[in-house]
Amino acid sequence: MAAEKDQQKDAEPEGLSATTLLPKLIPSGAGRERLERRRATIRPWSSFVDQRRFSRPRNLGELCQRLVRNVEYYQSNYVFVFLGLILYCVVTSPMLLVALAVFFGACYILYLRTLQSKFVLFGREVSPAHQYALAGGVSFPFFWLAGAGSAVFWVLGATLVVIGSHAAFHQMEAVDGEELQMEPV
């Protein structure tokens, strides 16, 4: 039995991604599988932020080519940049934290209540989708006061600027087929 536990420990991944608590919080299913696929395709952060590989594109064609290739190559890294910007926005806005706490608190209360018995409102049983819509309706004034709309557009704008500038100015390694192309004389 002890040998089996040692084998399980050896089979577990090591490093930063192994110590992340997020995958343990997400139940198994499609969401967890998607997160695992994203984590598996993350490119090395050292090459992602290597300052020696940034330069201005020579022309519009090269700019477009860099945008397409970098977005395709660093797609998972860009997803985590987006999530980091969301986290930054939420952490730096205390009222938005309160609004999120109200929303998730209402969802949790509804969840606990449905475990005990069916949720009945005005003599009618309320479906789970309607319950979460009710939680959203209760927390909507808090989101409105917190300026959640402007936070959403800030995150989208900041994401476009950060990812767009990185994709436009980051040089990709030359692919073997591109090195062998001949220029017309």
Curated annotation (Swiss-Prot):
<feature type="region of interest" description="Required for interaction with prenylated RAB3A and VAMP2">
    <location>
        <begin position="30"/>
        <end position="54"/>
    </location>
</feature>
<feature type="region of interest" description="Homodimerization">
    <location>
        <begin position="175"/>
        <end position="185"/>
    </location>
</feature>
<feature type="transmembrane region" description="Helical">
    <location>
        <begin position="95"/>
        <end position="112"/>
    </location>
</feature>
<feature type="transmembrane region" description="Helical">
    <location>
        <begin position="132"/>
        <end position="148"/>
    </location>
</feature>
<feature type="transmembrane region" description="Helical">
    <location>
        <begin position="149"/>
        <end position="165"/>
    </location>
</feature>
<feature type="topological domain" description="Cytoplasmic">
    <location>
        <begin position="113"/>
        <end position="131"/>
    </location>
</feature>
<dbReference type="Pfam" id="PF03208">
    <property type="entry name" value="PRA1"/>
</dbReference>
<keyword id="KW-0812">Transmembrane</keyword>
<keyword id="KW-0770">Synapse</keyword>
<comment type="similarity">
    <text>Belongs to the PRA1 family.</text>
</comment>
<protein>
    <recommendedName>
        <fullName>Prenylated Rab acceptor protein 1</fullName>
    </recommendedName>
</protein>
<feature type="transmembrane region" description="Helical">
    <location>
        <begin position="79"/>
        <end position="94"/>
    </location>
</feature>
<keyword id="KW-1133">Transmembrane helix</keyword>
<keyword id="KW-0333">Golgi apparatus</keyword>
<dbReference type="GO" id="GO:0005794">
    <property type="term" value="C:Golgi apparatus"/>
</dbReference>
<comment type="subunit">
    <text>Homodimer. Interacts with VAMP2 (synaptobrevin-2), prenylated Rab proteins, GDI1, NDRG1 and PCLO.</text>
</comment>
<feature type="region of interest" description="Required for interaction with prenylated RAB3A and VAMP2">
    <location>
        <begin position="175"/>
        <end position="185"/>
    </location>
</feature>
<keyword id="KW-0472">Membrane</keyword>
<keyword id="KW-0963">Cytoplasm</keyword>
<feature type="region of interest" description="Required for interaction with GDI1">
    <location>
        <begin position="165"/>
        <end position="185"/>
    </location>
</feature>
<keyword id="KW-0968">Cytoplasmic vesicle</keyword>
<feature type="topological domain" description="Cytoplasmic">
    <location>
        <begin position="1"/>
        <end position="78"/>
    </location>
</feature>
<keyword id="KW-1003">Cell membrane</keyword>
<dbReference type="GO" id="GO:0005886">
    <property type="term" value="C:plasma membrane"/>
</dbReference>
<comment type="function">
    <text>General Rab protein regulator required for vesicle formation from the Golgi complex. May control vesicle docking and fusion by mediating the action of Rab GTPases to the SNARE complexes. In addition it inhibits the removal of Rab GTPases from the membrane by GDI1.</text>
</comment>
<dbReference type="InterPro" id="IPR004895">
    <property type="entry name" value="Prenylated_rab_accept_PRA1"/>
</dbReference>
<dbReference type="GO" id="GO:0008021">
    <property type="term" value="C:synaptic vesicle"/>
</dbReference>
<feature type="topological domain" description="Cytoplasmic">
    <location>
        <begin position="166"/>
        <end position="185"/>
    </location>
</feature>
